[in-house]
C-alpha cells in the first residue's frame, strides 16, 4: 500500500514533459538576457543557474528559476548591491521586475507564471562566505553531483508532502523545511521513505549529519558543505513535531490524501467565540520584516494578557493584501472572575511581609496567611473582559505593550479588534481555522 501511494505521489510531485519544456524555454531565454547584461560589468566573474531548477528538484506547482551573478570578492558591498540590481532590472525590463530582500536585495519577475530571480553572490572559496547567497552555488554543485535521479524525485515528493501539510518554506512566516533542507535530508538518508522513518523516531536535539560542534535546537541538520552550520536552527518546534506526528501516521496508514490540499475553512463556533483578532494596516514592507514584527507583537501581547489573568491557549499571525495584518489569540475564556488572588511572601520574612501588607492593605478585600504561612490577598481585577483589556493596552499603553517600535506608528493610525465568529477576510478566516481546529492528518488516532 505504502509503495503504491509513493508511486502515485510521483504524478503530483514530478513535472511532466510539457512543464519541463516550458521552464527550459524560459530559463534559456532569461539566462541569455542576464548574461548579456552581466558581461557589461567588469566586477562580474560569471553567471550560473542555481536553486531547484539547476539541481532538478523543482516541483510543478511552483516554478522558479534562480540565476546567480558571481562578483569578484574585492567588489564593495555598495557596488555589489547597485550593480546586482542594475543587471536584474536591465535584463528583466520587459517583465515588470521588482526588488525583493534577503540579506541583500535581488531582482524578481514573473514570466508566464514562472518566478525568475536574479541573485548576486561573491566568487569565493568554500568557507569564505561574504553574503548569504554565497553558499548557494556550492549547494548546487554538491547536490547536482551527489543526488541520483531517483533521489531527486524523492526530494520532489518530500517537498510536496511538506507543502501540502503546511511545513514547507524557510521564510519567517513559515519557519519550516526549506527546499535545500529537503535535499540534504534525502542526501543523508537516501529516500523519501527513509526520511519519514527517521523523523517518526526522532529524539529531541538529534543530529542528522556530522559536525565537530554541538547545537541546541529540536532538530539538528548539518549542512554538508559547511559542517559548522545547523540548518535545523531555523525550523520551529511546531513544524518539527508536526513532521514527526505526520510521518508516524503515514508509515502506519499511507494514503494519497497526504499529498492533496485539504479544506481549512471550517470554524468551530464555540472556540471561535473565544478568539480575538487584532486587525491593522501597515506601510508596505518585505514579508520577512512584517512577519518578524507581527510575531514579536503577538508574543508580547500574549505575555501581557497572561499577566493580567487571561489564559491564552494559542496565538498566530497573518499578513495579507500587502498592507494588512492580523494578530490572533485563542483564549480559554474572554471573561474572567472580578476577584483575583495575589500571593505574597512568607510571614517569617519580616521585611518582605511587612512591605506586602503595606502595599496591598488598602486595595485588598481580604487578606490572610494560608496553611503554608504565606500571605494571600483577594483583590478586584482591573479588567474582567479580554477585549476591553486588549483595546486599552494598545490604545493607551502602546509603549508598554511590547509591540515593536517599527509597528507602533501603524497601530496609531488605527486598529480594530474582532471576535473570531465575526465575518472575516478569507486569509484571516483560514488562519482562524488553522488556530482552532485539530489537523486530522497530524493527530490521527489510526
What are these regions (language model features)?
Residues 51-59, 94-99, 104-108, 171-173:
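Catalytic micro-motifs at enzyme active sites that drive phosphoryl/nucleotidyl and oxygen chemistry
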Residues 150, 155-324, 329-342:
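Conserved nucleotidyltransferase catalytic core and NTase-mimicking acidic/glycine-rich helix/loop elements
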Residues 35-48, 92-96, 303-311:
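Short secondary-structure junctions
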Residues 323-446:
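Extended, charged low-complexity segments
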Residues 1-60, 74-78, 107-108, 121-124, ...:
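N-terminal regions immediately upstream of nucleotidyltransferase
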Residues 81-87, 341-346:
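Short amphipathic alpha-helices in soluble, non-transmembrane regions
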Amino acid at each position: 500500500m505504502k509503495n503504491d501511494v509513493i508511486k502515485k505521489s510521483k504524478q503530483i510531485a514530478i513535472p511532466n514533459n510539457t512543464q519541463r519544456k516550458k521552464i527550459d524555454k524560459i530559463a534559456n531565454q532569461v539566462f541569455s538576457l542576464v548574461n548579456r547584461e552581466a558581461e557589461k560589468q567588469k566586477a562580474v566573474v560569471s553567471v550560473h543557474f542555481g536553486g531547484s531548477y539547476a539541481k532538478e528538484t523543482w516541483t510543478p506547482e511552483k516554478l522558479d528559476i534562480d540565476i546567480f551573478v558571481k562578483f569578484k570578492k574585492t567588489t564593495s558591498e555598495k557596488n555589489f548591491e547597485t550593480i546586482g540590481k542594475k543587471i536584474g532590472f536591465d535584463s528583466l525590463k520587459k517583465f515588470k521586475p521588482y526588488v525583493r530582500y534577503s540579506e541583500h536585495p535581488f531582482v524578481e519577475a514573473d514570466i508566464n507564471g514562472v518566478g525568475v530571480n536574479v541573485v548576486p553572490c561573491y566568487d569565493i572559496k568554500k568557507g569564505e562566505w561574504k553574503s548569504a547567497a554565497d553558499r548557494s552555488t556550492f549547494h548546487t554543485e554538491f547536490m547536482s553531483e551527489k543526488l541520483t535521479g531517483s533521489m531527486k524525485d524523492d526530494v520532489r515528493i518530500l517537498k510536496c508532502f511538506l507543502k501540502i501539510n503546511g511545513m514547507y518554506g524557510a521564510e519567517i512566516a513559515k519557519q519550516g523545511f526549506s527546499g535545500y533542507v529537503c535535499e540534504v535530508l534525502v542526501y543523508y538518508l537516501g529516500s523519501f521513505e527513509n526520511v519519514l522513518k527517521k523523523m517518526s523516531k526522532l529524539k529531541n536535539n538529534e543530529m542528522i549529519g556530522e559536525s565537530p560542534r554541538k547545537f541546541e535546537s529540536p532538530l539538528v541538520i548539518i549542512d554538508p558543505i559547511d559542517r559548522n552550520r545547523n540548518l535545523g536552527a531555523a525550523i520551529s518546534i511546531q513544524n518539527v513535531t508536526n513532521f514527526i506526528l505526520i510521518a508516524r501516521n503515514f508509515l502506519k496508514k499511507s494514503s494519497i490524501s497526504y499529498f492533496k490540499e485539504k479544506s481549512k475553512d471550517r470554524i468551530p463556533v464555540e472556540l471561535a467565540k473565544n478568539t480575538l483578532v487584532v486587525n491593522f494596516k501597515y506601510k508596505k514592507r518585505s514579508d520577512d520584516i512584517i512577519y518578524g514584527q507581527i510575531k514579536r507583537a503577538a508574543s508580547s501581547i500574549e505575555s501581557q494578557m497572561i499577566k493580567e489573568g487571561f489564559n491564552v491557549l494559542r496565538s498566530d499571525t497573518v499578513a495579507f493584501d500587502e498592507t494588512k495584518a492580523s494578530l490572533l489569540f485563542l483564549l480559554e475564556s474572554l471573561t474572567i472572575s472580578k476577584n483575583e488572588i495575589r500571593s505574597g511572601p512568607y510571614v517569617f520574612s519580616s521585611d518582605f511581609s511587612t512591605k506586602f501588607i503595606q502595599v496591598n492593605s488598602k486595595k485588598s478585600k481580604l487578606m490572610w496567611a494560608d496553611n503554608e504561612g504565606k500571605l494571600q490577598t483577594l483583590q478586584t481585577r482591573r479588567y474582567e473582559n479580554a477585549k476591553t483589556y486588549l483595546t486599552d493596552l494598545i490604545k493607551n499603553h502602546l509603549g508598554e505593550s511590547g509591540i515593536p517600535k517599527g509597528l507602533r506608528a501603524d497601530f496609531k493610525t488605527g486598529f480594530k479588534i474582532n471576535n473570531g465568529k465575526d465575518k472575516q477576510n478569507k486569509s484571516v478566516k483560514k488562519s482562524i481555522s488553522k488556530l482552532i481546529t485539530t489537523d486530522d492528518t497530524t493527530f490521527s488516532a489510526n
